[in-house]
Swiss-Prot record:
Any GO MF annotation of the entry: tRNA binding
The keyword Transport appears for this protein: yes
Subcellular location: Nucleus; Cytoplasm
Keyword terms of this UniProt record: Cytoplasm, Nucleus, RNA-binding, Transport, tRNA processing, tRNA-binding
Known role: tRNA nucleus export receptor which facilitates tRNA translocation across the nuclear pore complex. Involved in pre-tRNA splicing, probably by affecting the interaction of pre-tRNA with splicing endonuclease.
GO biological process per UniProt: tRNA processing; tRNA re-export from nucleus
Main localisation: nucleus
Name by which UniProt lists this protein: Exportin-T
Gene3D superfamilies listed in its UniProt record: Leucine-rich Repeat Variant
InterPro entries given in the database record: ARM-like, ARM-type_fold, Exportin-1/Importin-b-like, Exportin-T_C, XPOT
Taxonomic placement: Eukaryota, Fungi, Dikarya, Ascomycota, Pezizomycotina
Entry-linked Pfam families: Exportin-T, Xpo1
Species annotation: Phaeosphaeria nodorum (strain SN15 / ATCC MYA-4574 / FGSC 10173)
Length: 1036
């Protein structure tokens, strides 16, 4: 067996073995693992002399591990494994032995020993710790003579802790109970001896292997969370910790001495982090003399020499962690209302001592160090906020904390002196800095809630002071100072325009708003817009857009700010240029009513940017680039579209005459028409770049249309665009249709045309209807995908809604072609998940389109002479969807369509509160459809039974229940509109299904009650769901 196991391991890990042979070997080893039967052979392999290779020993020990942990071996077998492995350890790790295991074999061995410990320590191996301690030697030899066995001893201690006390590992209740019992046994029997061994190792730390010292400290750090602190907190141990933590002159933080120093400080952190009573925690911090310890560490050369090669950021992060833990605990004590006065006073004293330390690390040049103390600074500020809310003010001893904290936050908000904004390869650093800024902003917001007036005063001083310095030519200012002022000014808006706009009745709406207005004036006066750094330029534009209301109240400043924006739209910096196009559109959209006589000048100033030059995508471009960093040709064109929308907004301003609106439209679109005409022949011949150029032109025309009109399709037609302007966009629509007809097989052209069509609605008004058949023919071609048809149906529904009073005749003409294209797509068999999703979406959009037609009083189109041939297909498709058990949302929607048809075509209610009343809504004022009541009884009423009878229908499923609720609503609508004939049909159906006479009466009575009000209607729905459930259960 031994040879078989060894051979299998060799084959499994030999890369030269054939795949088939390796597969067989792996399968054999997995079988041994699952059976747990090869542990004897594996144990023998591991301990064999001469030793096999490490991979064989490691895998063999893993098989032993598996048997110990998973197969519940009897105690005799476990004892045999224990004795065999301990014998191996004694031989291999004896002083002077040259056969010690490699590091990864040691770790595996200690894992096995830990599993054996968990199984045997409570019963038959109480000497577990003593056995390993004996290997490490007595007080004289532990650590500095028997180094290998001391390492092994500490490894064992670490493994035991990780197995039974690691809080980060999720465990079952059974494991938790076992671990609690084991920890109790260790605390009762061995922990004092273990603590003594730590003391013995550390007592001679200066002459001991420093890696061993570090490991000992890390081990103590693990154990302090669940042992009595007095075992490690005594004067000798604390003196040793302080000696290690206070080492000076360490040039390399990664050296053994540096690691020991950091481990000692981490041990302090773990000790401080131990849960205990508030008074005991304060006593502990003072006993450890941590105020002086931290103070000395901060003034040591390794932390005092900022911006020098000697600065040790690893040490800074380690001490910051200690400070963070101390402040966290002290704040928790201060928040505790049950703390005695002496403890509270001591905690107050500690906060005063540690706040400067906290701010020292918060302001550290390294963001990693700063981030380490943000949690405790957050806790401190949260405590002050609660105190302010509770007492109405912050006590003086705490109020003094706020100024240095806010100053430190603002300082950390500033770009580092070494930062190179926008440079290649800086994206990761930039992302990390912005993440830090977001965290700092949260702290700043907390300070605002504690002392709003101080925050306003501080930020105003910073921003106005910076802009004043710029105005006066202060040479010490750089882009980082200006960007910080603008960034803080941007954030300031959260307070200044929190509850309302910047102005109320032409006056600043709050004190903060008043200060923000002052900042805006300072910014404008400083000439900051001309500062050449891209980060400043971007923030300037963001500020102008965010606070556009300032310009509404100061219209004399609008020409200048627009001039600045126009300059920035021509920036040579690609990020500034592309972002400015978007922000320019945002600004002019807000200010279009105040543009006045400058409209033409602005359009002329950006006209050179409206030239479209399509570029085929470069396959080497990084497809994973973020939207902000994307500088591809496609991304730049998408930004360019904002310019077209912007000039549309400018050209259609209320301050522009109708004559000029038409002129501007001609000026902007004429070059596009010429380009389209010249490029179309090349695109017809299959030129990909020409096709992309046509796509871009169509998108630009659609986007211009969106900018050109404020009109939102609704029942109000008062804002329909001026006819002269509409004439120009009719030409645009015709040009797009020519391109669409020529390039109909191109999905990108269809996409662009669909995009433009939906945006032409607002500028063409009802003129669009004359072209609707051509649009439908182009956009619902045989090449169109299901996704395209779904999207177009949404737009067509919008057209129907918008022009319901004028569209009837045209809709009657186009309905059958539209339905035929839909039916053709619905009949497609999906070939994958994406197709299934698109098909489900198409079904829903088709049903929604029918609902729009019915709701807008256009139901007669569906049954007209022109479209009557499609009516049966419509009804059949709806019935099929209603019975589809795999798509409950669509099934519910399908039933709802049937309910709308009944409501529209069956005339007035026959029974219920609305019986014989004259209908008033557009949907129900349509003429009843002769004979439709009988059709409903024959065709729709059976669905109540055929839906739950459909294969796969599960009445217990939540979504299926919702379908049944809709089926109940269908029956309510039928009985309301048809009356007695339907009731008789129901009785017949129920009796035919084996329902007793009293059951039939109850069913009919409950259904009739649904017409009496909301409560009864709900009772009927619940009754029907339960009725179907009982019926299906009976059949089962």
């Amino acid at each position: 067996m031994e040879a078989q196991v060894e051979n299998a391991i060799q084959i499994a890990f030999d890369p030269t073995s054939s795949q088939q042979l390796r597969g067989q070997a792996v399968e054999f080893l997995e079988r041994l693992r699952s059976e747990g039967s090869a542990w004897q052979a594996s144990l023998a392999l591991f301990t064999r002399d001469p030793r096999p290779s490490d991979i064989i020993r490691h895998t063999s020990l893993d098989l032993v591990n598996n048997a110990v942990q998973e197969h519940r071996l009897d105690e005799q077998s476990l004892a045999y494994i224990k004795d065999t492995l301990m014998s191996h350890v004694r031989q291999s790790y004896a002083p002077g032995s040259s056969t010690a295991d490699t590091s990864h074999i040691q770790n595996k061995l200690m894992q096995t020993m830990t599993y054996l410990f968990a199984a045997l320590y409570p019963t038959s191996w109480r000497s577990f710790f003593d056995d390993f301690r004996a290997l490490a030697g007595d007080q004289a030899t532990i650590g500095n003579v028997n180094t290998a066995t001391t390492f092994l001893y500490l490894r064992m201690l670490v493994q035991v802790h990780d197995e039974i006390a690691d809080q980060l590992v999720a465990r079952s209740k059974e494991e938790t109970d076992r671990n609690t019992h084991l920890k109790d046994l260790i605390r009762d029997n061995d922990i004092q001896k273990i603590a003594l061994s730590w003391q013995e190792i550390l007592a001679k730390w200066r002459e001991t292997d420093l890696s061993l010292v570090e490991m000992c400290l890390r081990t103590i750090g693990r154990y302090v969370s669940w042992i009595r602190l007095e075992l490690v907190i005594n004067q000798d141990m604390i003196t040793t910790f302080l000696e290690m933590a206070g080492q000076q002159g360490i040039s390399d933080p990664e050296s053994p001495a540096g690691k020991v120093r950091d481990a000692a400080i981490d041990t302090f952190s773990e000790i401080v982090g131990k849960k205990m009573e508030p008074s005991n925690k304060i006593e502990l911090i003072l006993f450890l003399n941590l105020p002086d310890v931290v103070g000395q560490l901060i003034t040591s050369p390794a932390l005092a020499e900022f911006n020098s090669p000697n600065y040790d950021n690893d040490l800074a992060e380690t001490v910051a962690k200690l400070v963070n833990n101390i402040v966290f605990d002290v704040v928790k004590i201060l928040e505790n209302d049950n703390v005695d006065e002496q403890t509270r006073q001591r905690a107050d004293d500690l906060i005063r001592i540690f706040t400067p330390y906290l701010l020292r690390f918060f302001a550290d040049q390294y963001d990693e160090v700063c981030s380490t103390v943000i949690p405790s600074l957050t806790d401190l500020l949260t405590f002050l906020r609660k105190l302010q809310k509770k007492q109405g003010t912050v006590p003086p001893q705490y109020a003094a904390v706020l100024p240095p904290v806010l100053d430190a936050i603002i300082a950390k908000m500033k770009y580092d002196e070494t930062a190179d904004w926008g440079e290649e390869g800086e994206q990761t650093d930039e992302a990390e800095f912005q993440d830090l800024r977001r965290r700092l902003h949260v702290l700043q917001q907390t300070i605002t809630t504690i002392d709003e007036s101080y925050y306003i005063e501080t930020l105003s001083r910073l921003v106005n002071g910076t802009f004043s310095g710029l105005s006066q030519g202060d040479q010490s200012l750089n882009w980082r100072d200006l960007e910080l002022a603008l960034y803080e000014m941007y954030l300031f808006g959260e307070l200044a325009i929190r509850n309302q706009g910047l102005f109320a009745k032409r006056e600043p709406s709050s004190v903060a708003a008043q200060h923000l207005v002052g900042m805006m004036n300072s910014m404008i006066d400083s000439g900051l817009a001309n500062y050449p750094h891209p980060a400043v330029q971007l923030q300037y534009m963001e500020i102008c857009v965010r606070y556009y209301q300032f310009f509404e109240q100061n219209p004399h400043l609008i020409p200048k700010v627009l001039e600045n924006f126009v300059q920035l739209t021509h920036s040579s910096h690609v990020k500034v240029r592309s972002r400015s196009w978007y922000l320019f559109q945002r600004l002019v959209k807000h200010l279009r009513a105040q543009l006045g006589n400058v409209s033409y000048d602005i359009i002329q100033a950006v006209a050179d940017l409206l030239t479209i030059k399509a570029e085929l995508p470069d396959t080497s471009e990084d497809e994973m680039s973020s939207d902000e960093e994307d500088q591809s040709a496609d991304a730049l064109f998408n930004s360019q579209l904002y310019l077209f929308e912007a000039v549309g907004c400018i050209a259609s301003s209320n301050t522009v005459s109708a004559e000029n609106k038409k002129l501007y439209a001609q000026t902007i679109m004429s070059p596009l028409f010429v380009d389209l005409e010249q490029t179309l022949p090349q695109a017809r011949n299959g030129d990909d770049r020409a096709t992309l150029q046509i796509h871009h032109i169509i998108m630009a025309l659609g986007t211009l249309a969106r900018g050109y009109s404020d009109w939102v399709p609704s029942n109000n037609s008062s804002a329909v665009p001026h006819s002269d302007v509409a004439d120009e966009f009719v030409k645009a629509s015709e040009a797009i249709l020519v391109a669409l007809e020529s390039l109909n097989s191109s999905s990108s052209i269809r996409h662009a045309a669909r995009f433009a069509f939906s945006r032409m609605i607002a500028v063409l008004g009802s003129r669009l209807l004359q072209q609707l058949p051509s649009w439908i023919e182009g956009l619902l071609s045989l090449s169109s995908s299901m996704d395209e048809i779904s999207t177009f149906l949404k737009v067509l529904g919008q057209v129907v809604f918008t022009f319901k009073s004028e569209i009837s005749n045209i809709l009657d003409t186009v309905m059958t072609p539209v339905l035929q294209r839909i039916f053709s797509a619905l009949a497609t068999t999906p070939s994958g998940t994406d197709d299934e999703i698109q098909l489900a979406e198409l079904r829903r959009e088709y049903l929604n389109f029918l609902i729009v037609v019915l709701n807008q009083g256009l139901g007669s189109v569906l049954v007209s002479n022109t479209n009557q041939s499609s009516f049966e297909t419509i009804i059949s498709s709806i019935e099929n969807f209603a019975r589809d058990t795999h798509d409950a949302p669509t099934a519910r929607l399908a039933i709802f369509v049937l309910i709308r048809m009944i409501n529209v075509w069956c005339g007035p209610d026959k029974v219920g509160p609305g019986a014989n009343q004259t209908p008033t809504s557009p949907a129900t004022t349509q003429a009843p459809l002769p004979g439709f009541e009988n059709y409903v009884v024959e065709r729709f009423s059976p669905l109540a039974w055929s839906i739950p009878a459909s294969p796969g229908f599960n009445s217990k499923d939540a979504q299926a229940k919702q379908v049944l609720v809709e089926a109940a609503n269908l029956q309510t609508e039928i009985v309301k509109k048809v009356g007695e004939p339907y009731v008789e049909r129901l009785k017949s159906d129920l009796s035919g299904n084996g329902v007793a006479a009293d059951g039939v009466d109850q069913y009919v009575r409950t259904l009739a009650g649904a017409l009496e009000g909301t409560k009864k209607e709900k009772e009927w729905r619940n009754f029907f769901v339960q009725f179907v459930d009982r019926m299906l259960s009976g059949r089962g």
